[in-house]
């Protein structure tokens, strides 16, 4: 089974070419560092427009066949930060524990983490996770929840993702003997 992971950088300025897309590239680099499972990266940069974010999430989940989509940016309280709303609009189930865990981890580093509205949800066989827009924050937040991501993808019928245990251990419950 071909594994496709999606990364969407939500940024007005990056989508207009006004600055280099470092958040999205940082996210792909982290996934390549942590995963030993070969994967193809689906990639997009979209403006902070809810309809465009929703359309790209649907395209990656439904057409590109991504088992995991991570978004970067658009998770704060500013009026144009609508990534969580777009995620909720396209998901059948929400996983609020992801946002709670990321905020808890970030609060140990910076008090403004409480302003983050990032979340996660499931669309079909795809897990969608919102991340902040700064590369340092992306790593800190993704590290807080990544140990649960491969098992979540197992549970929703996606491919088995294996990681480099030295750089990113994951948790999968052991099967109980029959």
Summary of predicted features, one role per range:
Residues 1-178:
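Non-catalytic beta/alpha edge segments that cap or flank active sites
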